[in-house]
Curated annotation (Swiss-Prot):
Name of this protein: ATP synthase subunit alpha
Alphabetical UniProt keywords: ATP synthesis, ATP-binding, Cell inner membrane, Cell membrane, CF(1), Hydrogen ion transport, Ion transport, Membrane, Nucleotide-binding, Translocase, Transport
Protein species of origin: Pseudomonas savastanoi pv. phaseolicola (strain 1448A / Race 6) (Pseudomonas syringae pv. phaseolicola (strain 1448A / Race 6))
Residues at the site labelled Required for activity: S374
Lineage start: Bacteria, Pseudomonadati, Pseudomonadota, Gammaproteobacteria, Pseudomonadales
GO cellular component, one term: proton-transporting ATP synthase complex
Length: 514
């Protein structure tokens, strides 16, 4: 047997080491290691980027969300039943994009922008990235133009401006969606384009919303993005970003748009599901650590941008116009608990909230807006002049009424001033009630507020406030159409309008026809 010299052994090893090729090889293709619950683990995708689209056999796509040392965790967009262990996965070098443009108006699409309304393919070629960086501070402009929701309670006390983020928060089944849908219906003649994003809702509910928008003539002005409860968690997580990109198309071209996210609680639940399946460490209420960033990067994209931004974006094609994207995110609370994790996050991100209360809804006050805890942080500057002038005492009257009503339960005899204040509060509360799918014009709203502010409701029975208001508005639209048209066009409040309203209401009250 031949004996090897130790020095020879070391020479052989050195030679082998020198010949070894240790240069790293970039690989564009990997192998599926495991598939479960819409999550795919892939080995060998060395140069994949976060958020990049990954192509699987059969035209199925995924999105890279976890970049680990020896594998990539990706979420499948759509059905994952055709995928199996051992299949190949390729990098595409692209991030997720969805179709954008005016061709989407009047259509219902899924989270990836595919039409689901049976009206044929989309006739557009333009696409844009789902994840985009929000405009910087320099490119933004302050909010000073109103978005009329058509609700007295909102437009008078919690006004919303173009480019604002106003949260609608409350328990289930108390009119959150109804308020948002009415706001969309009210935009059909305002020139504001609308996007309605349905996240994790029943398909029957989404179909009902689409039907109501069509019946009220607002669908032609609206894009509906639907990620129903039967869709995968990945599509429910992506739907708000897709809708936001579609809304930004209008903002960046000097138009105004309104987007409703219904609702972000379900998006957070979908994201929690994805994160737990990706084995990310859970935090409070089992949500991942970046659930705040999930909503902040979405809602920061709603903004009012300057003329310079629009001009730069359109390469000078549009000049002298600002663009805006107004967001109405909806959050569902559990038994009125606004201190839960997701509600507190979204309250801190948005520019105010409209708080809907179960007790008010159940007592027949609809919309059930609690004026005491609802606030609009930037909308005051955007409020129409006449509404701002006439709504000053409304909020105070309601706040004082709620406080006095609590004490009045224990007091047996009340002084005259307190009794009058209580009665005025009851009348204002009654006046704030409004039927669904019946948004009001600025002139109609101003007339109601004027009657309350100037004491014309004092001798009207509380039970007849609603019929009095309807008859008064009908009378003014018939006999004082010029005055109403002037208010709707300009929104100003002057002595001429003041005296015209006063004389008209006095004349109407003399007829006693309500």
């Amino acid at each position: 047997m031949q004996q090897l010299n130790p020095s020879e052994i070391s020479e052989i090893i050195k030679g082998r080491i020198d010949k070894l090729d240790v240069t790293s090889q970039a690989r564009n293709e990997g192998t599926v290691v495991s598939v479960s619950d819409g999550i795919v683990r892939i080995h060998g995708l060395a140069d994949v980027m976060y958020g990049e689209m990954i192509e699987f056999p059969g035209g199925v796509y995924g999105m890279a969300l976890n970049l680990e040392q020896d594998s990539v965790g990706a979420v499948v967009l759509g059905a994952y039943t055709t995928l199996a262990e051992g299949m190949s996965a390729k990098c595409t070098g692209r991030i997720l994009e969805v179709p954008v443009g005016k061709e989407l108006l009047g259509r219902v699409v899924d989270a990836l922008g595919n039409p689901v309304d049976g009206k044929g393919p989309l006739n557009n070629t333009e696409t844009d990235a789902v994840e985009k960086v929000a405009p910087g501070v320099i490119w933004r402009k302050s909010v000073d133009q109103p978005v009329q929701t058509g609700y007295k309670a909102v437009d008078a006390m919690i006004p919303v401006g173009r480019g604002q983020r106003e949260l609608i928060i409350g328990d289930r089944q108390i009119g959150k969606t109804a308020l948002a849908i009415d706001a969309i219906i009210n935009q059909k003649n305002s020139g504001i384009f609308c996007v309605y994003v349905a996240i994790g809702q029943k398909q029957s509910t989404i179909a009902n919303v689409v039907r109501k928008l069509e019946e009220n003539g607002a669908l032609a002005n609206t894009i509906v993005v639907a990620a129903s409860a039967s869709e995968s968690a990945a599509l429910q997580f992506l739907a708000p970003y897709s809708g936001c990109t579609m809304g930004e198309f209008f903002r960046d071209r000097g138009e105004d748009a309104l987007i409703v996210y219904d609702d972000l609680s379900k998006q957070a639940v979908a994201y929690r599901q994805i994160s737990l399946l990706l084995r990310r460490p859970p935090g409070r209420e089992a949500y991942p650590g970046d659930v705040f960033y999930l909503h902040s990067r979405l809602l920061e994209r709603a903004s009012r941008v300057s003329e310079e931004y629009v001009e730069k974006f359109t390469n000078g094609a549009v000049t002298g116009k600002t663009g805006s994207l107004t967001a109405l995110p909806i959050i569902e609370t559990q038994a009125g608990d606004v201190s839960a994790f997701v509600p507190t996050n979204v309250i801190s991100i948005t520019d105010g909230q409209i708080f809907l209360e179960s007790a008010m809804f159940n007592s027949g006050i609809r919309p059930a807006v609690n004026a005491g805890v609802s606030v609009s942080r930037v909308g005051g500057a955007a409020q129409t002049k006449i509404i701002k002038k006439l709504s000053g005492g409304i909020r105070t009257a309601l706040a004082q009424y709620r406080e006095l009503a609590a004490f009045a339960q224990f007091a047996s005899d009340l002084d005259e001033a307190t009794r009058k204040q209580l009665e005025h509060g009851q009348r204002v509360t009654e006046l704030m009630k409004q039927k669904q799918y019946a948004p009001m014009s600025i002139a109609d709203m101003a007339l109601s507020l004027y009657a309350a502010e100037r004491g014309f409701l004092t001798d009207v029975e509380i039970a007849k406030i609603g019929s009095f208001e309807q008859a008064l508005i009908a009378y003014f639209n018939r006999d004082h159409a010029d005055l109403m048209a002037k208010i709707n066009v300009k929104g100003d409040f002057n002595d001429e309008i003041d005296s015209g309203m006063k004389a008209g209401i006095e004349k109407f009250k003399a007829t006693q026809t309500w």
